């Protein structure tokens, strides 16, 4: 199989193909958060649901955007990110909660 085939085929885990996602994709871990973000989009459409990976694609202020859940932990996130890149995602932004051990980071701080 050539790399061109890999990039044009439906991806096994996220169940999407090229054209299903916008160039910018938000990736929360929790699948429940995807519907919250979809409610903030214009023209939101559910394009896939497979295992922990749920995706909506729409627009925000006229800009195409997608939101795909990845589940918890590094392995499913890595799988999701690799497959999203194969089908055209260019900007992937992880959103959600995290922990920190630095004393200057209090609950509620935004970490980028």
Language model feature labels by segment:
Residues 2-112:
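Metabolite-binding pocket within alpha/beta catalytic cores that recognizes anionic/polar moieties
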């Amino acid at each position: 199989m050539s790399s061109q085939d890999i990039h044009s085929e439906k991806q096994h885990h996220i169940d999407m193909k090229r054209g299903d996602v916008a160039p910018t994709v938000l990736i929360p871990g929790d699948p429940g958060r995807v519907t919250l973000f979809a409610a903030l989009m214009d023209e939101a459409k559910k394009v896939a649901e497979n295992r922990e990976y749920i995706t909506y694609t729409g627009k925000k202020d006229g800009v195409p955007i997608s939101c795909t859940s990845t589940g918890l932990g590094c392995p499913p996130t890595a799988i999701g990110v690799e497959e999203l890149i194969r089908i055209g995602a260019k900007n992937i932004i992880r959103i959600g909660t995290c922990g920190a051990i630095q004393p200057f980071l209090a609950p509620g701080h935004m970490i980028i």
